[in-house]
Amino acid sequence: MSFEVIQRDKNTRARLGRLKTFHGEVNTPVFMPVGTQGAVKTLSPEEVEEVGAEIILSNTYHLFLRPGQEIIKKGGGLHRFIGWDKPILTDSGGYQVFSLARLRKIEEDGIYFNSHIDGSQYFFTPELVMEVQKALGSDIIMPLDICLGYGASYWETKEALEITLRWLKRSIDYKKNNNMETQLLFGIIQGGFYRELRKEAVERMLDMELPGFALGGISVGEPKDKMYEITDYTVSLLPEEKPRYLMGVGAPEDLVMGVSMGIDMFDCVLPTRLARHGVFYTKTGRRNIKNAQYKEDFSPLEEDCDCYTCRRFTKAYIRHLFLQHETFSYRLLTIHNLRFLFRLMEDVRRSIREGRLEEFKKEFLTQYLANDRENRLEKEEVWNRLLI
């Protein structure tokens, strides 16, 4: 199990890489579809593979609550349980504890929280989170961490970082003592939007001999310029030979920008969630299938798209299904949205290989954002500056 940088872009921090895991290789930069409960919503594993996925993400918090790690372990581990034989990354559940759970209480040993499902109380420790992920058998695992929202004070953020780093050390110790050699434990870099704290996090993690680094606490309500600024700064501190994972980020423009900053891995629920609300991606921005203009539009969602949806069906038909609340429409839109992102990543990797990423980035962002009225950034001048 290893990570190899195959080619670097001359003008940015972007690179092509290959991440080898117990269940196979992953070409980077890569987007990972999210299968929160063990399934990418509305799709079969075969459909997920067909759109281009090499790795998926599942959620420790949700799988711990239902069906529970013991059921999955008895079923042969997560891969066999869900029918997916390629790599799987599981996050620690820390973000979900802070975003979904109620009445949470942080102590040195871990986090007390009440399930968002039925209110039952649980106590997550770094060791328990590792134990759950061991039972799942996922290829890449994450330690328990504290994720704060945008606007947290310096001292609140510093305290959360200190606990996160101590929990990381405990997670590493658990892994070493419990026969988890086939699983790669990444460190999660916290520190909010304070450069000093991000730097401290990286410096202390460099001594822990981790196989990869995840950037956490990003895309938590901050403006886009803040997100890009702290991402770019944090990546500049990281070693070249290790993979970098930007957690919870996956909008098309963020993928392109993130790759140019040196990010190798992304995940996000956005493409599947948008699909269930009738929103689909095009090269000129997001569109909504509910719009009346598509009532008699017998063209595909996007003319040059090679996905199953665009090869077989028209906007008019998909709109009809969606307005009748037919679940097939959610599936068709999900297939298209995921394939759009995988085609985008294919184009990004090709542009790196051909030494023209900067040119591709400018062309894509100019076209995508100029017409994307439903997805305007908070400050257009930010993009003007980034495209110079």
Swiss-Prot record:
Catalyzed reactions: 7-aminomethyl-7-carbaguanine + guanosine(34) in tRNA = 7-aminomethyl-7-carbaguanosine(34) in tRNA + guanine
Chain residues that bind substrate: D91, S92, G93, G94, Y95, D145, Q190, G217
Swiss-Prot/TrEMBL keywords: Glycosyltransferase, Metal-binding, Queuosine biosynthesis, Transferase, tRNA processing, Zinc
Biological process, per Gene Ontology: queuosine biosynthetic process; tRNA wobble guanine modification; tRNA-guanine transglycosylation
Manner of cofactor binding, per the entry note: Binds 1 zinc ion per subunit.
UniProt binding sites for Zn(2+): C305, C307, C310, H336
Active site per the UniProt annotation: D91 (proton acceptor), D267 (nucleophile)
GO cellular component: cytosol
GO molecular function annotation: metal ion binding; tRNA-guanosine(34) queuine transglycosylase activity
Uppermost EC category: transferase
Pathway: tRNA modification; tRNA-queuosine biosynthesis
Entries under Pfam families matching the protein: TGT (PF01702)
Annotated spans, RNA binding: 248-254, 272-276
InterPro entries in UniProt: ArchSynthase1/Queuine_TRR, TGT, TGT-like_sf, tRNA_ribo_trans-like
Enzyme nomenclature, EC number: 2.4.2.29
Cofactor(s) for this UniProt protein: Zn(2+)
Described function: Catalyzes the base-exchange of a guanine (G) residue with the queuine precursor 7-aminomethyl-7-deazaguanine (PreQ1) at position 34 (anticodon wobble position) in tRNAs with GU(N) anticodons (tRNA-Asp, -Asn, -His and -Tyr). Catalysis occurs through a double-displacement mechanism. The nucleophile active site attacks the C1' of nucleotide 34 to detach the guanine base from the RNA, forming a covalent enzyme-RNA intermediate. The proton acceptor active site deprotonates the incoming PreQ1, allowing a nucleophilic attack on the C1' of the ribose to form the product.
Entries under PANTHER family matching the protein: QUEUINE TRNA-RIBOSYLTRANSFERASE
Subunit structure: Homodimer. Within each dimer, one monomer is responsible for RNA recognition and catalysis, while the other monomer binds to the replacement base PreQ1.
UniProt record similarity statement: Belongs to the queuine tRNA-ribosyltransferase family.
HAMAP family: Q_tRNA_Tgt
Name of the protein this chain belongs to: Queuine tRNA-ribosyltransferase
Organism: Dictyoglomus thermophilum (strain ATCC 35947 / DSM 3960 / H-6-12)
